[in-house]
Amino acid sequence: MPAYRSRTTTHGRNMAGARGLWRATGMKDSDFGKPIIAVVNSFTQFVPGHVHLKDLGQLVAREIEAAGGVAKEFNTIAVDDGIAMGHDGMLYSLPSRELIADSVEYMVNAHCADAMVCISNCDKITPGMLMAAMRLNIPAVFVSGGPMEAGKVVLKGKTHAVDLIDAMVAAADSAMSDEDVQTMERSACPTCGSCSGMFTANSMNCLTEALGLSLPGNGSVLATHSDRKRLFVEAGHTIVDLARRYYEGDDASVLPRNIANFKAFENAMTLDIAMGGSTNTVLHLLAAAREAELDFSMKDIDRLSRRVPCLSKIAPSVSDVHMEDVHRAGGIMAILGELDRAGLLDTSCTTVHSETLGAALARWDIRQSNSESVRTFFRAAPGGVPSQTAFSQDRRYDELDLDREKGVIRDAAHAFSKDGGLAVLYGNIALDGCIVKTAGVDASILTFSGPVKVFESQDDAVSAILTNKIVAGDVVVIRYEGPRGGPGMQEMLYPTSYLKSKGLGKACALITDGRFSGGTSGLSIGHVSPEAAEGGLIGLVRDGDRISIDIPNRTISLDVSEAELAKRGEEERARGEAAWTPKDRKRNVSAALQAYAMLTTSAANGAVRDVKRRFGKN
């Protein structure tokens, strides 16, 4: 039977000093035999998805104490990708994921915590904490701050549901008046919470449900709704139970690596494909799987993408459906239920709250459940009042959305498409693969071929789009923005949003070794691997070349002869130390970012650090 990790600091004569320090934090003699639970919070006033978390850590802590544990809270950093977008601040977003994972490891291992509750929400925070949970492999429960309510705006006498992306597109549209743009801006983000569509933050919080590490509703119940309080309360009780089961009952099934095993990662990716989640989730699932020492790869994602249908389209794939609508249709448990009925899930996987995923679906899938409390839970509605306060309203819809033929969530027989919402493409320009969010691609451009216009920074591409140098039929290539080449693998939300504002969202393609915001839609192909800075073929593309894209057949190719590419490769290598770097780009790269660039791997490997490779170890 494993001993509580915390005994290292709470037992024995030689730990008198450590116990003295624990006592100074408020612990008493009776506490030294209890599990010490880390409450990993991520409150910050910089991020709307985290601005309401300040008191929620202590809410969880009180419940842990009531259940017989000792709670100790600490905080991680949190970057707002939307505020960091469009300038060099975005270089720091993805690297912050590694810092978050490390900071959790440092605090938990330094103080020998026995288990943890991870209070996350936005883009890199949930993935960073997930990586830490898989790395540490101690009992863990995830609970997010929840999505914000969708904005509502009246334009020309008609009410529209809007979000951050709508405001960005409107601002770049010269046909929109300043007054209308300001109205959109003021309406786009009305409450606290993660941005209201199926962007990266909400995608990841939904995936923790499929992985079995969070409670039902974690990904969909609104930040402002009183029902979300129950998730925080239950997280406190649940983690103490899991800790006791492991340390006192010798039950290793409750550990993250045994819950989120290979089959659970397949379930999560299946959900991701079915709901058209953010392409960033591919990076994060690969990174978390690596921490869990699982051989889960792009090949597995490709395999799953060929058999999983698209069962839901949510903003940004469509403009009028947001997370509040997904919740009304039964949330993530409803999508998982439809996938199960289609034979696409392994429901034998365990969860932190149920013996198996199958048992969880029997209770929480609204097409199976007879529980009135479950149905009431999924009727939680937006309050429609601007608020930065958690649990500030308790409004409910009169009815659930149970329409599986034309509703927000479809069954497999009425899927939006037989192909899922994410796809992996391969070809000479992406030997290790690249990612496209097919749920956001118009059917008319699933196959596309056009002349290339090459840019070696996001800024140059944006300038070209806004000055009308990009025309219908063009393939925009932005390179040297990968994990190493950026460094930091910037999101390309501004270029894709500006293409929309110019009426080119269905007339152009954008290809990059960088990545895209969860708010991106259109023919946007990212994570091209190997990246230009690693000698990838994308580094040899020139203006006027043609690139052909065939999503149904999962191919992408640079239509240039092998002989010409060999010649270009020789010319590039002849640049010596400057080879495989941008020719004219001026960018200040800090020592912190240089360190990330030295250690990072390809997007095809999750853009994680590989210290062994750096120092020549096997």
From Swiss-Prot:
Q: Show the Pfam families listed in the entry.
A: ILV_EDD_C (PF24877), ILVD_EDD_N (PF00920)
Reactions the enzyme catalyzes: (2R)-2,3-dihydroxy-3-methylbutanoate = 3-methyl-2-oxobutanoate + H2O; (2R,3R)-2,3-dihydroxy-3-methylpentanoate = (S)-3-methyl-2-oxopentanoate + H2O
Q: Which cofactor does it need?
A: [2Fe-2S] cluster; Mg(2+)
Give the GO molecular function terms: 2 iron, 2 sulfur cluster binding; dihydroxy-acid dehydratase activity; magnesium ion binding
Subunit composition?
Homodimer.
Q: Which family does it belong to?
A: Belongs to the IlvD/Edd family.
Question: Under which name does UniProt file this protein?
Answer: Dihydroxy-acid dehydratase
Organism field: Rhodopseudomonas palustris (strain TIE-1)
Species lineage: Bacteria, Pseudomonadati, Pseudomonadota, Alphaproteobacteria, Hyphomicrobiales
